[in-house]
Amino acid sequence: IHLSASEEVTFSKISAELQDLGFEISAMGGSSYAVQAVPAGLEGLNIPDLLRDMIASAQEKTTAIHDEINSTLALTMARKAAIPMGQVLSNDEMENIFNSLFSSSNPNYTPDGKNILCILKQSEIEHLLE
């Protein structure tokens, strides 16, 4: 991956957090870097784009404290690793996702804070179908 000067400055600030998350990135000289390993579950993604998004997120955070950077990086990774809407899944894949969701510590909300599920009364459903 080749980084601009501003991206390189931000990258140097977050490289330890990236390593903690499971990335292995080494300098190749100039502004070029080699990605040697990525966190489990991110294989097959466009890693240069993912890293640029993570760097951009870190650049937007002017008060970049350790926890905030980790939260931003983890959220970016979660968004990139998410199953695209409309993707067809096998029954086993759906069952695995369902079981993983309800064994998580917060099964009600996405990383962005959006509702995953909503309980409606029968009267509310009937009203929606009118």
Language model feature labels by segment:
Residues 1-130:
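Long, charged low-complexity intrinsically disordered regions
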